[in-house]
Amino acid sequence: MMPERIILAYSGGLDTSVAINWIGKETSHEVVAVVIDLGQGGEDMEVVRQRALDCGAVEAIVVDARDEFAEGYCLPTVLNNALYMDRYPLVSAISRPLIVKHLVAAARAHGGSIVAHGCTGKGNDQVRFEVGFASLAPDLEILAPVRDYAWTREKAIAFAEENAIPINVTKRSPFSIDQNVWGRAVETGFLEHLWHAPTKEVYSYTDDPTINWNTPDEVIVGFEHGVPVSIDGSPVSMLGAIEALNRRAGAQGVGRLDVVEDRLVGIKSREIYEAPGAMVLITAHAELEHVTLERELGRFKRQTDRRWAELVYDGLWYSPLKTALESFVAATQQHVTGEVRMVLHGGHIAVNGRRSAESLYDFNLATYDEGDTFDQSAARGFVYVYGLPSKLAARRDLR
């Protein structure tokens, strides 16, 4: 009889490296490790694949999903100007549904009836993975050894040392890091103390904002129907736009975020994020919407932007509400075409120019100089009618 196969989402890090070895010892099941290349950089994917085999996986598969991630997951984040709690551009959250998709495909291809992840019981990712599996493949069983067997980082490190698992994490450098082309997330260690400032070794995607203080970088991002299509006039793919802006904005220290966020499980958590390209693209897209969207549409979309970010953060990528919101957002992007110019400097993004053939900005109506076509004589009656409800309420309250 063939051994049962477990399909594991493998990152190459501590928890999933330990999980391969532990699953083999405790269950006698075979592990197929699935590595998803989301443009995380760092180690070569072949090195990560070989580590999975060295840890005991019977097979290790690398899926190049960089373009798919950029087009299908990062782009919607831009279209929705998605910042959870008005700050976090969903660096990790948007990657989980794509990983789920490829794990389900691997389970079907390799005859696995169990999928596994290395998430803890305190984080959001357990929800994102398992709700995703329930949405795409409710027949699959789920194994979560880190959560279900209460592994701590100390226990995982000890297990790795005892079993000669090839992973370089020690108690002296206990950061938990998740990264992809959209950004980088760092947590645990001394960062769990809210008063401790992050030190330079925490950062990787961004330089010290003071290094290039004398050489600010001006960049123009072009959009067609909300989609980034050019940088400084040169055509780019979505992946190319992210990568180019990661380099340029990262060199200016742009995209560093020190956030205390409300996790889905009910606790607050401190995270350090680096998302230079993401923050530039979201800033530019939102600015172009200010120019091209009618006032009421813009107001309402800002509400749906926030709700979309919350749904994705909370692991509801496949929810009917998110799908419906995206249909609405697609309709809003018809006129979001044009260019936004920004200066990247000292860790900040400063918009200093916008232009669009679809602009609702009318110079002749807006100017205070000669040539003003705004009929100011109409304002008196408008103000009277507009303020009438407040006037009536105030008169009543003074009785």
UniProtKB/Swiss-Prot annotation:
GO terms for cellular component: cytoplasm. It is an enzyme of class 6 (ligase). Pathway: Amino-acid biosynthesis; L-arginine biosynthesis; L-arginine from L-ornithine and carbamoyl phosphate: step 2/3. Keywords: Amino-acid biosynthesis, Arginine biosynthesis, ATP-binding, Cytoplasm, Ligase, Nucleotide-binding. Pfam families: Arginosuc_syn_C, Arginosuc_synth. Its EC number is 6.3.4.5. ATP binds at residues 9-17, 118. GO terms for molecular function: argininosuccinate synthase activity; ATP binding. Disulfide bonds: none annotated. L-aspartate binds at residues 120, 124-125. It is found in: Cytoplasm. Homotetramer. This is Argininosuccinate synthase. It comes from Mycobacterium leprae (strain TN).
